[in-house]
Amino acid sequence: MAIILGADAHGNALKELIKSFLQEESYDIIDVTDINSDFIDNTLAVAKAVNEAEGRLGIMVDAYGAGPFMVATKLKGMVAAEVSDERSAYMTRGHNNARMITMGAEIVGPELAKNIAKGFVTGPYDGGRHQIRVDMLNKMA
């Protein structure tokens, strides 16, 4: 499984910490960050890379997480969640089959960011009754 990472200038330091953590956990990391671009361009780069292959997940970090969430949810086939706790990160995989999360470096500290990333990438999709909602989301965009 490849994890696609991106950040703007405000989220880059936290993204680098997440990157190191996930590499230590033996995940394949693809960093699409362009530090000279804003959150919109970096979010689009993460989402595009996630959508290029099955089994990819994305994490985008900026100052607050809200902007990248808004961008990601505009894209066809992208189910994304803005998260600031590890349980939500885990559950958005299980119940929503989210392929991307966004978080804010001014909201989430280093240890919490690692736990969020771990919860997201280890969370299995439960399918079943949740697939109805996922299908509804996919029809919207």
From Swiss-Prot:
Documented EC number(s): 5.3.1.26
Enzyme class, spelled out: isomerase
GO process annotations (BP): D-allose catabolic process; galactose catabolic process; lactose catabolic process via tagatose-6-phosphate; pentose-phosphate shunt, non-oxidative branch
Residues annotated as transmembrane: none
SUPFAM superfamilies attached to this UniProt entry: Ribose/Galactose isomerase RpiB/AlsB
InterPro entries xrefs: LacA (IPR004783), RpiB_LacA_LacB (IPR003500), RpiB_LacA_LacB_sf (IPR036569)
Stretches assigned to coiled coil: none
Pathway(s) this gene product operates in, as recorded in its UniProt entry: Carbohydrate metabolism; D-galactose 6-phosphate degradation; D-tagatose 6-phosphate from D-galactose 6-phosphate: step 1/1
Domain of life of the native organism: Bacteria
Catalytic activity: aldehydo-D-galactose 6-phosphate = keto-D-tagatose 6-phosphate
Pfam families in the cross-refs: LacAB_rpiB
Gene3D superfamilies in alphabetical order: Sugar-phosphate isomerase, RpiB/LacA/LacB (3.40.1400.10)
Family: Belongs to the LacAB/RpiB family.
Binding partners and assembly: Heteromultimeric protein consisting of LacA and LacB.
PANTHER family reported in the protein's UniProt record: GALACTOSE-6-PHOSPHATE ISOMERASE SUBUNIT LACA, RIBOSE-5-PHOSPHATE ISOMERASE B
NCBIfam families tied to this protein: lacA, PRK08621.1, PRK12613.1, rpiB_lacA_lacB
Protein name: Galactose-6-phosphate isomerase subunit LacA 1
Gene source species: Streptococcus pyogenes serotype M18 (strain MGAS8232)
